[in-house]
Each structure stands twice: as C-alpha cells, then as structure tokens.
Amino acid sequence: MSAPSPSLLAAARDMAGQQHYPQGALYMVATPIGNLADIGLRALHVLDLVDCIACEDTRHTAALLQSYGLHKPLLALHEHNEAEAAQTVVQRLREGQRVAYVSDAGTPGVSDPGARLCAAVHAAGLRALPLPGASSITALLSVAGTGGHDGGFVFTGFLSPKTTERQREVQAIAADPRACVLLEAPHRIEALARDLAALGERPLTIGRELTKQFEEVAQVAARDFPAWLQAGAHRTRGEFVLLVHPATAAIDDNMDEATLRTLDLLLAELPVKTAVKLCAEISGAPRNALYQAALARRKGAQED
C-alpha cells in the first residue's frame, strides 16, 4: 500500500480533530491486523498528534508508520520490559506529553502487551484512552453466525503450549456451554487441532490470516479440524483465530418437574447464569442441560 495522500491525512485531521485529545494521556491505538487500509481516521490523527509512540516492536511500527507517511519517536515496550518501560511512559505523561501505544497488530492489551502499561498509568492517576479499531476477535465473531447473543462468549486467548495443561483447558471449553474464542500461532496450530478434535461434532469457525491476501474463513466440526489443516499445505501457515460454537447439549425431556419448577422460580428473580448455578446446586441436575433449558424458557417467555 502506498502512503495516503496529503488530502487523506488532512481529512483525518479535520474529522478526528473535532474531539479533544488531552495532554498527559496515554492513547491505546488499534492498528490493522493485516490489511493496511483498515487503519482508522482517528488512529491516523492521534499517531500524528502524539509526542511519542510506545510499541511492541520498533522496526515493525516504523514500517507501519512509513506506510501512512508518519514519522515519530518510538519507545520499545514489549512483554519482556513492560513494567520498566511503563514507568518511562508514566514520566512522559507527567511532563504533559501525549503518548500512543500500539502492538504489532490489532487492539493492544488484548493477548498483546499493553495491559500492564495501562495499569501503571491508572495507578499513577493518569488517563488511558482507547482508539478502537481492528480486532481478529470481533472480526471472526461477525462472520461466525453465533455472536454470543444466546449466552455470551468467552475469550481465552492463547492456550498453554504445554500438552497436558492445554488438554485440560480444552476440557474446560467442552464443559462451558458458551461460545469460546481463542488464538493460535502457526507453529502450534496442529497440536491444538488434535486436542480440539476431542470436542467431536461441536461446530468450529476457523479464521486464518484474516484481512490478508490469502485469508480463509471456514466452518467444520471440531473433530474434522486436523483433516481441514492437512487438506492444503498452506493451511498451517499464518495466524489463527478460532471460535468454538456454543454447546448444544440436549435438554433432558425427563428432567423432573420439581427441577424445572425450581429453575422457573429462580429465573423469575435472577440472571440466567446465577439461576442455573443455584438450580444445579439445589437439584444436582447437569448445569449444561439446565443452561439450555433456561435459554429455551427465556426465549419462549419473550415470544409469548
């Protein structure tokens, strides 16, 4: 991508400049996850406005800025020096500087460095402000066909690189009726696929290299994920975001009336999760089945 024309940067300043950007504040700026055209106008404005940009990788960020015709002093802040570098940022903020933080791609602080930086800024009584933008998490959710509206979703990020611990984490996903979003790197994707195959028929939406030239979005049963990877040599390359769809545990038609009555009484007064938890403790019924029953009863009540 060639650098944006001066008129585009001027338009970004005109549109985004209508908002106040206080001095002495940290700006957490989302950057593209692949396609450079996904940069936000406010992101361009703030990256041009700030006194300094802290970043996960100075070489990567320098190249990114050059793509947009921007040049700023850079400060390395990554997982290995975040605590120390955060204090440097805090000092700059105390001096009244505006500082931006960007990770290598996407929204900083979400499975990327930046969270400890924000914690240090808040602890110092200073401001941290978000500039939302690209995120592989919401990108995949938007095309998965299950936005978590029927029970929410959980984001687990990267699972453990250790086999036993990762398999234990997959078991926890299996027991959770909600949708689950996770990330994985290319060198570990085959091992993760083998473990996720234990989820059997549970649907899985795969996002590979999202927004890039060779992006792929596919849906398979979890048990078929290893075979999907092996169907093309290119499929083990690139960054992955995965969505394990909500469990579809069958509701036991023979669940006793007393349990269902208890569930109804709890649902009348409490949120679904709390009602299900208490009903499971009272009745001993499986939480998965109770959760599905609760969702069905709430949906039926809304339609009546």
Provide a role label for each language-model segment:
Residues 46-53, 125-129, 178-180:
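Short active-site oxyanion
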Residues 76-83, 159-163:
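Conserved helicase motor
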Residues 116-176:
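Class I SAM-dependent methyltransferase SAM-binding "motif I" and its flanking Rossmann-like core
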